[in-house]
Amino acid sequence: NDFYDPNFLVRGDEMYLIDWEYSGMSDYASDLGTFVCCSDYGYDEALRVYELYFGRSMAPEETRHCVAFTALASFYWFVWALYKEACGDPVGEWLYLWYRNTKAFGNKALELSASL
C-alpha cells in the first residue's frame, strides 16, 4: 500500500523494499495501483506494468480491476496530500501527480466498466 520508488533501496543487482508503515494483507492491485499512481506512467505504460507483474496478457476484468485500483490509490494519496498541505506540510509535485492520475485512471476505469 506504500509500494513506490522512494521505498526501494537498490544496490547493484539487489533490491530491498523498506518502509512497512502502510503494509497489510490486501488485494494485489493495491500495491500495483500505488506503484503506478506514484509514477509518471501514462495508461499504456501502466498496462505494461500490470502485464509484467502477471507475466502474461491480462483478461479484461483484470485490466479493469487494476486500472480502477490505480484510480482509487491516486484519489487516496491526493486527499492525503490535500490534508498535508492544509496542515502546512507541502508535498510538492506529488499533489498534482495524484490529482492527474485520479482523473485519468478514474475515467479509464469507467470506460472499461462500460465496455464489459
Features from the language model and the residues they span:
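Intrinsically disordered, low-complexity N-terminal regions enriched in serine/proline/glycine
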Residues: 21, 52, 95-98
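Short conserved motifs of the RecA-like P-loop NTPase core
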Residues: 62
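ATP/Mg2+ or Mg2+-diphosphate-binding catalytic cores
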Residues: 79-116
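Active-site activation/catalytic loop segments of kinase-like enzymes and analogous catalytic loops
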Residues: 29-58, 71-89
